[in-house]
Amino acid sequence: MNIIENIEKNDFSEIELAAIPFNTLADHYGSALAKEQLALEHESYELGERRFLKMLERQAKAGEIADNAAAKPLLATLLPKLTTRIVEWLEEYASKKGRKPSAYAPLQLLKPEASAFITLKVILASLTSTNMTTIQAAAGMLGKAIEDEARFGRIRDLEAKHFKKHVEEQLNKRHGQVYKKAFMQVVEADMIGRGLLGGEAWSSWDKETTMHVGIRLIEMLIESTGLVELQRHNAGNAGSDHEALQLAQEYVDVLAKRAGALAGISPMFQPCVVPPKPWVAITGGGYWANGRRPLALVRTHSKKGLMRYEDVYMPEVYKAVNLAQNTAWKINKKVLAVVNEIVNWKNCPVADIPSLERQELPPKPDDIDTNEAALKEWKKAAAGIYRLDKARVSRRISLEFMLEQANKFASKKAIWFPYNMDWRGRVYAVPMFNPQGNDMTKGLLTLAKGKPIGEEGFYWLKIHGANCAGVDKVPFPERIAFIEKHVDDILACAKDPINNTWWAEQDSPFCFLAFCFEYAGVTHHGLSYNCSLPLAFDGSCSGIQHFSAMLRDEVGGRAVNLLPSETVQDIYGIVAQKVNEILKQDAINGTPNEMITVTDKDTGEISEKLKLGTSTLAQQWLAYGVTRSVTKRSVMTLAYGSKEFGFRQQVLDDTIQPAIDSGKGLMFTQPNQAAGYMAKLIWDAVSVTVVAAVEAMNWLKSAAKLLAAEVKDKKTKEILRHRCAVHWTTPDGFPVWQEYRKPLQKRLDMIFLGQFRLQPTINTLKDSGIDAHKQESGIAPNFVHSQDGSHLRMTVVYAHEKYGIESFALIHDSFGTIPADAGKLFKAVRETMVITYENNDVLADFYSQFADQLHETQLDKMPPLPKKGNLNLQDILKSDFAFA
């Protein structure tokens, strides 16, 4: 039975024909725009349904329908039934004397729930991709899947440490059963050769055993669930008489009904052609028709989480979100024309545009069939290209969607983007195509309401142009000088961007191209030129800025430009400089390479391994060159909870692996060792640069850890205090609840078939409880994100009420508006930062909100509030580069 064909398409006409929103919109904007807006909202649901069903069809063809949300509840319902039947069958024959069934011994090798899960997944996969299959084919496939799990699962179960350390990550990087299995065969052979797994090779099951296992599981599946049924075909015809398996119609209907329901609540939200519906409650804002899935003001993980906000009085928060989404935008047609022209070029001048075609694989060596070393080297090079190609395809699909949306709305005089918030209070645009996207998306959008640029606006336009070119780490006069030096280049790009592609060489090419067009407009029309290009003022490592301000930390504050300075303080560059100083010392005086002996904990086998000394590692990094780009992500994420181990992975992913893929990282002979060495240097350097921020993060973690701890009486073991979530309120009145809970389900891990969460049985059903580890590790990033979210919202309201600014381009720590109002926003962003931390001691407020929840035995364990420094918050008002 074909599930896709049985899905009944949704009728979304209630959206387009909704009378109340139509009448409201018609009264304000006319019936034509009212009709168009509701048609767009209707279309968003149709597009979402199409996307969902396309994904479902793709998964069905690939045999992966069990991974779709439509099938997961069915699996969760059937899994306990089949598991129980398998347990009963095993127990029945365990107590019987005499010869056991052929399937008995093999099925004892797996946990019953694992056998049940594999059965459901394999049978669903085979029947949704082919409608029906012979029982022999299904049994053979199922029996083989059971054997594979028994065979390779022993690596995970018997050699757990080895699997975690050396196998799991590499296994997860491989996609497709064939590649995963080939990899595990190599791993298995290597482990057996080294005496692991008892030194015994797997004794493969014969075809008869495989068939017995498969048929017995299919029989139990039919007995316990009725998921499949046997149909006899061509009865009496000796040549073609056979029994086939197919999904029972009731389950086809269940899957089709759920898939249809999910498809109906998966809209691909689009921009609006009228101002979004104002937020006045926690649901129902943004889009005018409610639809099947009305927007929520706060993105939470559950309805219960959302309802916490129902009675919260937070007028400033509502005001800010409504101002953000009331900003009118339009498509920048000049930039759009250029993108449409170049995006399909084979040699696109913009390096970041993903190409239409895959990079060619390296030529195979002539002796590849006989030279194992050559084959291995070629495979390694090809693997890098395949990995890059997967990312290319994903980026290309995203690019084409954004471009399609830009072309779709290009004729509109104005469009709007509904906004809402995550649970920490960070403000997000709802449609996929929005002003918070990448450089191309931002370049394709401009504000709809401009003003005569004026002299001050022209000044800020030049600063913006230099920033887009990457000339943003120098004082303003030098940025202006850069623009004035390149006036001819800028005007040439504006006149003929297809043939003059200097703009494509800049740091943010499409935003720079948009600047070129506006600069040419001012040049040709003078200071009365009406300019609507959004100019952005970006924070300087925002997380550290907020920690430094709340702690009055002069050292950290200076490093992130909170204090006035003649030059731009670049914390990423400062850390890179400190790292380079150590590298130069280590290159001369560092430790030498050494061969170290490694003893296998399980087998006692001793082997030798080359450990690079700090001298060699330093020389490798000096040869590569450590700049701010190497340290940037690690320093930036420090305020968001990243530590030395996290730095290591970041360095590996962001610097070393791309360098190796591009051929520029050949010096890194031991990538993991090079990453670990650099991570330690960055950690040490940043820890002495922003001491107060690190102290505040540790203090927050201590608080979250104590709140998440269960307090028991030492003698009676009576629980004196249950684990608590963490709650605080931001300066503008937004309440934040951090409540990570342990999942109720138990996770079932398969070697090849992924993961599944088992619903607990009646006997094991308990409150999941607070996840203490996540509470502790999440508090620092979530707390500082909530503070920058509050600062953004306060800035929007303040800038509107004090300076009359109406248009806002907002991305968390980036504040933008039109050039004529840029000078006002430049002041507003600093003034609200000062107001926030002069009027609020956010750490003390946080402490006061949870102190009474601590048990008396915990009070001594809570460290005192971090000490404050001598930073004068008023100095932020005089800092050119705090947000620049």
Curated annotation (Swiss-Prot):
One of its GO terms (molecular function) is DNA-directed RNA polymerase activity. Signal peptide: none annotated. Transmembrane segments: none annotated. Keywords: DNA-directed RNA polymerase, Nucleotidyltransferase, Transcription, Transferase, Viral transcription. InterPro entries: DNA-dir_RNA_pol_helix_hairp_sf, DNA-dir_Rpol_C_phage-type, DNA-dir_Rpol_phage-type, DNA/RNA_pol_sf, RNA_POL_N_sf, RPOL_N. GO terms for cellular component: DNA-directed RNA polymerase complex. SUPFAM superfamilies: DNA/RNA polymerases. Pfam families: RNA_pol (PF00940), RPOL_N (PF14700). The keyword Transferase applies. One of its GO terms (biological process) is DNA-templated viral transcription. Disulfide bonds: none annotated. It catalyses: RNA(n) + a ribonucleoside 5'-triphosphate = RNA(n+1) + diphosphate. It is an enzyme of class 2 (transferase). The active site is at residues 538, 632, 813. The keyword Transferase applies. SMART domains: RPOL_N (SM01311). Its EC number is 2.7.7.6. DNA-dependent RNA polymerase catalyzes the transcription of DNA into RNA using the four ribonucleoside triphosphates as substrates. Belongs to the phage and mitochondrial RNA polymerase family. This is DNA-directed RNA polymerase.
